Swiss-Prot record:
Protein name per its UniProtKB record: UPF0502 protein Shew_1617
Record organism: Shewanella loihica (strain ATCC BAA-1088 / PV-4)
Signal sequence residues: none
InterPro entries named among the record's database cross-references: DUF480 (IPR007432), WH-like_DNA-bd_sf (IPR036388), WH_DNA-bd_sf (IPR036390)
Family (UniProt): Belongs to the UPF0502 family.
């Protein structure tokens, strides 16, 4: 079952904070909501309420992808992922692959070059070739966790998308509607140009009539 955009953001944040701020991990509901709504390193930027985050956590708990953890003497419930690399996880990934999945969940489709540039706090890739090797490995898993997208016109590199959430379906729908939108825009522009030409012709006729009247 694919993750929703809110669930994907929650898992991505838990993966990120586990690596970048281990002293604050697991995360409280408030801390996780703040992480989900960060304006940096997030695409798109979200504005989740704590109720939204809690709903995503409840759904992920049913999928056995997150678990609660209460500290000794603390009433604050904290949350940790069970997405990968835990005793309860079927999925076992090396650190480089976790970094890539984390970035794709948090920032959407990206090129290998973008992933290398943005991964410095998660994993130290030596070069883009190492990123591509990890991406190819993720794409060849069963089931595949990433997919290479067709290269966009005017772009030098192809982007990669994660296959864990609904992002792929949403992107395919978006791409399918673009030709229709482009056609609609072209028709609108044509109508405007015809109307402008008709106006210019009418003005010329008026000018000719005025000139003939003066002869």
């Amino acid at each position: 079952m694919k993750l929703t955009s809110h669930e994907a953001r929650v898992i991505g944040c838990l993966l990120e904070k586990e690596k970048t701020t281990p002293e604050q991990y697991p995360l409280s509901l408030n801390g996780l909501t703040l992480a989900c709504n960060q304006k940096s390193s997030r695409e798109p930027v979200m504005n989740l309420s704590e109720a939204d985050t809690q709903a995503a956590l409840d759904s992920l708990a049913k999928k056995r992808l997150v678990a609660e953890q209460s500290g000794f003497g603390s009433r604050v419930v904290k949350y940790k992922h069970r997405f990968c690399n835990t005793e309860f996880s079927d999925l076992q990934l090396s650190e480089d692959k976790v970094a890539i999945i984390c970035l794709l969940l948090l920032r959407g489709p990206q090129t290998a070059g973008e992933l290398r540039t943005r991964s410095n706090r998660l994993y130290g890739f030596n070069d883009v070739a190492q990123v591509e090797q990890a991406l190819n490995s993720l794409a060849q898993m069963e089931p595949a966790l990433v997919r290479q997208l067709p290269r966009e016109p005017g772009k030098r590199e192809s982007r990669f998308i994660e296959l864990i959430s609904e992002a792929e379906t949403q992107l395919d729908t978006q791409l399918a509607t673009q030709p229709a939108q482009a056609s609609s825009l072209a028709n609108d522009e044509l109508v405007e140009r015809v109307a402008l030409l008709e106006q210019q012709v009418a003005e010329l006729k008026l000018q000719v009539a005025e000139l003939l009247g003066k002869i």
